[in-house]
Amino acid sequence: MSLPAPGWTAQDIVAHLRSIGTEENRAGMARFGINNATALGIGNADLRPLARKVKRNHERSLALWDTGIREARLMAAFTGEPKKIAIEECRRWAGDFDSWEIVDTVSDLFVDTPFWRQLVEEFAADEREFVRRTAFAMLAWAAVHLK
């Protein structure tokens, strides 16, 4: 496989992720309360540099999310384009949240959308634990980064 590049497809990224994951990392995630049911065993220290290499791409981020794989979903958040993601896509992603880690990561992307305040209101009123947490994670991110 070639080196990571902006032209990589979602399938290329997933294949690469499958090749670098470890069972040791996967087991370690559980100790931190991270849902590892779909995890390949790759830490954020490896995912973030990969995301910088493949760059942002909205359509690819949607395809990565749809794999259901923990690391692919984190890559979707890291490489998503906040000006292109639709509010309906944000709502759909939030409905899939199953871990504090994914909530806190995707919240960073959501805050950069033009409709983030509307999402905060909706998500804060939601009964689902991780959707509601998203509202508060978004507010925390906004308080620090949107001055």
Q: Language-model features: where?
A:
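Alpha-helical scaffold domains
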Residues: 1-147
